[in-house]
Amino acid sequence: MPTLHLISSTLNDELYQQLMTILLDDDVLLFTDQGVYNMQSRNALLNQYTCYALISDLQAYGLLEFVKKTSCKIIDYPEFVQLGIHYERSISWH
């Protein structure tokens, strides 16, 4: 069963390793709040997994233009809700 991983803070090395250990190929990442900073520092995630980021957080942290150049999908709050409905299982990383 695919999992939606909600990443809302900057992952330290230990949390990052835990995440990498449990991620499956069909899992999805959603970056929110300060978690959007991981998109720069942990950009290997962007190439290996389907990922999403909230546009309001990207704008707030000045990362919108950076993320537009990646394969990450930029979404709004209604789309965030739809992701939560679609994925029966979610894990929050913070």
Label the model's feature ranges.
Residues 2-8, 88-93:
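Short hydrophobic beta-strand segments
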Residues 18-19:
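Short acidic/Ser/Thr-enriched loop-to-helix initiation segments
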Residues 65-94:
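C-terminal structural segments of small proteins and small subunits
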Residues 14, 37-40, 76-79:
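A short, acidic, amphipathic alpha-helical segment used as a generic capping/interface helix at domain edges
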Residues 29-34, 50-57:
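Short internal beta-strands
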Residues 36-47, 63:
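N-terminal beta-loop-helix "entrance" segment that forms/cooperates
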